[in-house]
């Protein structure tokens, strides 16, 4: 292998990729440049999907929109470009991921210094022979040519003048711009200087580009000199590594080749013995694995839009080329591990995000392998017939039915020397849009009515959610604001019917899936719909959501993608519900039957027929039994059979439920077998953990158990743990002491409350002594009606009795008050009548009850002493006044 021979040849020049990177940054750091870490591949610039150049992080500085980080800067910037993706692996130097070494001047040094340093770095640090170097300048940049020729000393015959298309940089139609100068390496200097053609990439490779930003271009194309001139340079790390390591292409440098070796090892092949076709596949794998590893590290996840689509496309190309070289099993985790190990020294964040990177690689690979296997089988049948080309209809069927990307069909066709009828593909897509419009209904009803009528007029939705969680679909119907519509725009809440869907529609107690619909949309700029519920109406699935971006119209093709995390939680909860019913039958009563259920993303609820409460001990047994089944890792068996076969096998059905002739049976062997149309885990171990939260009664003879499973258990326990931590902090005890401490506090509180009640009673008696003077004479009787707040019922009774004792047997005492003056929601009224009043037929119990009604309450008691309560403190004064009037009339 060429790399191993070239990395060390006895001299001190940088050779490895790491050495080249370090040498470049050190060279400019020693010349007062601030070393700037690589920015993310996800740029801050909203007009650009990915970081495509080393200067992109500094673009706001060059455009005058941000302050410069320093007068001089240098960086090694990771970049991604996919405009030439079809050339990756087929040419010596095309890549998707690459590192751009750069030095920058923000209004500091300019052209001559930049050229001199570039030459010094190239010839003295990297040790390249000037005889192997050629430079280019813009055709009108006499200054640059003069510097190269007279200051640096480059042979004039090896200075090439180039047109604007090659050697003039501009940020856009207007704004900062300027000429460029490039340094090329000549692999064949013996051919001489008379016939130099820089387009000959077999002889020349451009490795260092110097941009001199010295002009501003106005709307009419006029160039005026900039007051502050800037320098932007870029050296391709991979290209310099190829030159210094003496290998035939960038892929066989130490920067990429270890990944090729890893992939070749997984395939059981010797890369150096392969033909060009085989080598191309391994080059694609090596290049793309660097790209997707860094994309995931920088927060990009696979999707069908924007940078997420770029990552998905790259990842799928890796899997596809892996299969071409015989790697049939999932291998992206191994490639991800190798990529991290290769690049972690320069990018430590790869290690920090290792788990995230590997998890995303595994998920997306598994998802695509399903699609790939189905599509390749169909495509193989097409190719057996030796067609002249793959028809548009065939390509569309692969795309529409099997989710096979068009570009992948094109790539496979090209490998067989065929083309794809793209015009026919577009026609097939348009025909589907027309069919969708013809199938759409036109109604003007309320939302529910609209959905019901729509469901009645449409064919049943093809549900694919047992097999796939993502697939292309066509929009058949739209409802906006309760009316059918042909299109919906950003901000609209919509109900959408698709011809087929991976989304589970709410039924059998399980909630509908969440997720996203995405596609090109009618505006061509992309549409995104968040789906937050799915319901079923006559086997038509209605997706409830909101248009987040773009415009959606009838006939549009969208990619339906279920939120996998939500689906996994629902699956765990649904299978846990089956285990719960089995445990209840085993622990409590074998005759227990289901009365209802709820399977949500973060909780589950199971209602069952039972005449008594489930004891705490039984709940512990149920919980232990279920967690035991989870840890035993039972594989679930899901199959369809006739209802008679299912019942004969012992499958549990819900009483009163109507079932079709053919039913779906979910079997946890030896544990549970139920008729069920919901989604479930493949193995009980996927549930993780099960925890009962509550047991209660919902109706006569019906009990309810609420529980959590999977990740929700951790959230529940964390919440409980947080409560305990706060208690420990407040009580200043250890966990083992908390029960004893709380019991002690309860006793202290009980004692304090008893003492407080006694104190209030004494206070009431003390206060009441002064009230005796307020009694008024009504004939031969004494009447006292007064308000006394801040006293509980017992204290108020003591006060009334004490006043009656002072006033004698011919007295009537009525007291009212608020036990808590700040709470007008609780009123207490007390009446104490002497023997003479009772002899006249007056009774304290009846009297105080009638008065309490004025405060929104009631009560009563003995003829001589009674207490009542009320809920309206604002009416208390009026009630006491009424008591005074009523007694005056009764006693007068």
Swiss-Prot record:
Amino-acid positions noted as binding Zn(2+) in the UniProt annotation, renumbered to this chain: 574, 578, 676, 680
Protein name as it appears in the record: Alanine--tRNA ligase
GO CC, alphabetical: cytosol
UniProt key word Nucleotide-binding: yes
Organism: Prochlorococcus marinus (strain MIT 9313)
EC main group: ligase
Required co-factors: Zn(2+)
Keyword hit for Iron-sulfur: no
GO molecular function, one term: alanine-tRNA ligase activity
Biological function: Catalyzes the attachment of alanine to tRNA(Ala) in a two-step reaction: alanine is first activated by ATP to form Ala-AMP and then transferred to the acceptor end of tRNA(Ala). Also edits incorrectly charged Ser-tRNA(Ala) and Gly-tRNA(Ala) via its editing domain.
Cofactor detail note: Binds 1 zinc ion per subunit.
Predominant location: cytoplasm
Cell compartments where the protein resides: Cytoplasm
Catalytic activity: tRNA(Ala) + L-alanine + ATP = L-alanyl-tRNA(Ala) + AMP + diphosphate
């Amino acid at each position: 292998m060429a790399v191993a021979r070239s990395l060390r040849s006895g001299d001190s020049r940088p050779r490895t990729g790491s050495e080249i990177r370090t040498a470049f940054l050190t060279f400019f750091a020693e010349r007062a440049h601030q070393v700037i870490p690589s920015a993310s591949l996800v740029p801050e610039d909203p007009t650009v999907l990915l970081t495509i150049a080393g200067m992109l992080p500094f673009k706001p500085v060059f455009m005058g929109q941000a302050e410069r980080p320093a007068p001089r800067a240098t960086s090694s910037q990771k970049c991604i470009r996919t405009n030439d993706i079809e050339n990756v692996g087929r040419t010596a130097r095309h890549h998707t991921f690459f590192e751009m070494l750069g030095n920058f001047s923000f209004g500091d040094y300019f052209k001559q210094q930049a050229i001199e340093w570039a030459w010094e770095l190239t010839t003295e640090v990297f040790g390249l022979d000037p005889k192997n170097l050629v430079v280019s300048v813009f055709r009108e940049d006499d200054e640059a040519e003069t510097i190269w020729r007279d200051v640096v000393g480059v042979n004039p015959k090896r200075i090439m003048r180039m047109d604007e298309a090659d050697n003039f940089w501009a940020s856009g139609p207007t704004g900062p711009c300027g000429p460029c100068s490039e340094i090329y390496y000549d692999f064949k200097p013996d051919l001489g200087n008379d016939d130099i053609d820089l387009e000959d990439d077999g002889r020349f490779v451009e490795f260092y580009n110097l941009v001199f930003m010295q002009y501003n271009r106005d709307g009419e194309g006029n160039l005026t000199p900039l007051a502050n001139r800037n320098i932007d340079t870029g050296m391709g790390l991979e290209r310099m590594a190829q030159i210094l390591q003496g290998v035939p292409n960038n892929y066989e440098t130490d920067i990429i080749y270890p990944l090729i070796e890893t992939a070749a090892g997984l395939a059981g092949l010797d890369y150096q013995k392969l033909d060009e076709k085989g080598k191309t596949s391994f080059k694609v794998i090596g290049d793309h694995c660097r790209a997707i590893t860094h994309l995931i590290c920088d927060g990009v996840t696979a999707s069908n839009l924007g940078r997420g689509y770029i990552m998905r496309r790259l990842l799928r190309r890796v899997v596809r080329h892996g299969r071409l070289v015989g790697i049939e099993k999932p291998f992206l985790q191994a490639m991800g591990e190798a990529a991290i190990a290769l690049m972690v020294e320069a990018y430590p964040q790869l290690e920090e995000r290792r788990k995230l990177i590997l998890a995303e690689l595994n998920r997306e690979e598994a998802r695509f392998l399903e699609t790939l296997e189905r599509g390749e089988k169909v495509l193989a049948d097409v190719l057996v017939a030796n067609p002249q080309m793959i028809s548009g209809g065939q390509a569309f069927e692969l795309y529409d039915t099997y989710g096979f990307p068009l570009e992948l069909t094109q790539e496979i066709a090209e490998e067989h020397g065929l083309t794809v009828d793209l015009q026919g593909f577009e026609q097939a897509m348009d025909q589907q849009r027309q069919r969708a419009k013809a199938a759409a209904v036109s109604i003007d009803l309320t939302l529910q009515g609209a959905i019901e009528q729509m469901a009645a007029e449409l064919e049943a939705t093809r549900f694919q959610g047992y097999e796939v969680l993502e697939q292309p679909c066509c929009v058949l119907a739209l409802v906006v604001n309760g009316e059918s519509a042909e299109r919906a725009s950003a901000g609209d809440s919509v109900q959408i019917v698709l011809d087929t869907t991976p989304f589970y529609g709410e039924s059998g107690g399980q909630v509908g899936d969440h997720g996203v619909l995405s596609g090109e949309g009618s505006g061509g700029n992309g549409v995104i719909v968040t789906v937050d519920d799915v319901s079923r109406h006559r086997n038509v699935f209605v997706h409830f959501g909101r248009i987040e971006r773009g415009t959606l119209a009838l006939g549009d093709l969208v990619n339906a993608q279920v939120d996998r995390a939500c689906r996994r939680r629902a699956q765990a909860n649904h299978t846990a519900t089956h285990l719960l019913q089995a445990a209840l039958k085993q622990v409590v009563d074998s005759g227990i039957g289901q009365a209802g259920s709820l399977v949500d993303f973060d909780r589950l609820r199971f209602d069952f027929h039972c005449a008594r409460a489930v004891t705490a001990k039984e709940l512990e047994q149920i919980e232990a039994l279920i967690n035991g089944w989870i840890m035993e890792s039972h594989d679930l068996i899901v199959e369809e059979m006739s209802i008679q076969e299912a019942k004969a096998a012992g499958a549990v059905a819900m009483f009163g439920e109507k079932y079709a002739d053919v039913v779906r049976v979910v079997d946890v062997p030896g544990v549970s077998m139920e008729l069920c149309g919901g989604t479930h885990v493949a193995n009980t171990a996927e549930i993780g953990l099960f925890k009962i939260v509550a047991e209660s009664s919902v109706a006569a003879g019906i009990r309810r158990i609420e529980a959590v499973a999977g990740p929700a258990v951790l959230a529940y326990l964390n919440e409980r743990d947080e409560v305990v931590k706060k208690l420990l902090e407040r009580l200043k005890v250890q966990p083992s002491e908390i029960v004893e401490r709380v019991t002690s506090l309860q006793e202290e509180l009980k004692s304090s409350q008893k003492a407080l009640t006694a104190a209030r009673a004494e206070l009431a008696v003390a206060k009441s002594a002064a009230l005796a003077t307020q009694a008024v004479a009504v004939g031969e009787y004494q009447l006292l009606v007064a308000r006394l707040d801040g006293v509980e019922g017992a204290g108020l009774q003591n006060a009334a009795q004490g006043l009656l004792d002072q006033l004698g047997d011919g007295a009537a005492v009525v007291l009212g008050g608020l036990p808590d003056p700040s709470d007008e929601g609780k009123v207490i009224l007390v009446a104490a009548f002497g023997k003479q009043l009772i002899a006249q037929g007056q009774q304290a119990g009846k009297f105080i009850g009638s008065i309490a009604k004025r405060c929104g309450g009631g009560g009563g008691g003995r003829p001589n002493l009674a207490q009542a309560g009320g809920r309206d403190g604002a009416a208390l004064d009026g009630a006491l006044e009424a008591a005074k009037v009523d007694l005056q009339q009764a006693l007068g």
